[in-house]
Amino acid sequence: MIEFRTLDTSDQSVLWGWLHIALWDPPPAGLRPREVLHDPGVRIYAEGWGRPGDLGIVAVVNGVDAGACWMRVLPEGVGLASIDDTTPQLGIALEPCYQHRGLGEPLMREALGRAWQAGHEKVSLTVHPENPAIPLYERCGFGKVE
């Protein structure tokens, strides 16, 4: 059974790990070196988590944090999924042992529901064109924007 809890400031260290997982590259590349988390264009998605407007949830399976979906509003033009300065940019990651087990969709739907409740009319994300999670994003209402 999956439960959800709020991603809060006490989750800062584990959020870095989830951000690292979210930086997906097609096989055979595997995970990027952790040093990528020092890149300013990557750090913006997790650094100082808990700012006003940050929104995130953690998927908990049998008492274990399985992954998270988080969103942050950034200034226009900042971030790979930037649309404007009011639309949150979304990140999602599941620990490898919880991937491909049907957890991503309920996690994302719960996070999107909370975003709508917070007054966000839209949410953006960026994804590698070969990422196998694209059908999940489409089922959750995302579409391709050029």
Regions found by a protein language model. Name each.
Residues 1-13, 17, 21:
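Conserved N-terminal entry element of GNAT/NAT acetyltransferase domains
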Residues 19, 32-56, 60-61:
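Active-site rim helix/loop that mediates acceptor-substrate recognition in acyltransferases
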Residues 58, 64-74:
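Conserved beta-strand in the GNAT
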Residues 138-146:
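Conserved acetyl-CoA-binding loop of GNAT-fold acetyltransferases
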Residues 104, 108, 128-133:
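Short glycine/proline-centered loop/turn elements that form peptide/ligand docking sites
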Residues 89-100, 127-128:
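A short, internal acetyl-CoA/4′-phosphopantetheine-binding micro-motif in the GNAT/acyltransferase core
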Residues 115-128:
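Conserved GNAT acetyl-CoA-binding A-motif
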Residues 94, 100-117, 138-139:
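Conserved acetyl-CoA-binding loop-helix of GNAT-fold acetyltransferases
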